[in-house]
Each structure stands twice: as C-alpha cells, then as structure tokens.
C-alpha cells in the first residue's frame, strides 16, 4: 500500500488508521523479531497470524458499516483520517492545512462545500483544540463529534470510530 501525501508534498504519518497497512507492519515486525530471536520464531509467527486475522475481521466490519453511509464525504479538523477515507471509498476534507488553522478563504470554501453536500458534522480529535471546529459546525448548522485515533485498544477503537462515523454520516 502506498503512503498518502499531503498537498504540500509531506507524507501522511497517520498510517496506523488503516488496518490493511497495519497488516504490513505486523508482518514486518514478526519477520524481524523472528530473525533477531529465532528461538521464539513460532511464537512471533502465531501472534502475528492471530492479529492479522483480527485485522481482517475489523477491516470487513468497517467496510460493511461504511458502505451504507448516506454521504461519502466528511470534514475533519485535523487531516488524520485520510487512510480511512482511502481504504473505504470516502473523501476526507480537512480544515487544518499543513498543521495550521484554516485561513478565512479555506474556511469559506469548506463552509460552501458543507452546505452544497449537506455535510452536518465535523470530526475532531480529542488531542486538538476544538474551538475552530465548533465555530465551523455552528456556521454550517451542524455539530462536532470527537474521535480518538490514539486510544489504547486499537481494534476496539477502530470499531468505535467506524460506528461513530457511520452514525454521523
């Protein structure tokens, strides 16, 4: 799977939000751990196989959930969800650009998009200040919804985020 890039040309670091890309990481970790510690190769391979099965399962659950959303477009404050969008046939639009708050021009473009596409929700992460997201939601007559891409339980969190997005979209 290729990395995503931002308009500025930088690489999108939010790769962990793609179960299919995480599978590549799990396989690489198991391979390297087995090479470094051959006595436990079987354990690493079994643990990897178990986790890969969980990733396949959650990928299918997310795919099924997001297939039925009314809108295939969503707006976020911080552009962390591009891999989710790419993997599941959605389009992410972000207020923040290159780590900076949106300019007045970009905000207006996003307001126009939200109104044209009837997007009534903006997702934001618990790690960021939500004031611009809240002001944006007020402008479009919508609401903000918090997602937690850094939550501790990865599999459960992916399911929770997909359920939240499905309900909101």
Report residues per predicted region:
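Extracytoplasmic metal-acquisition and chelation regions
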Residues: 1-169
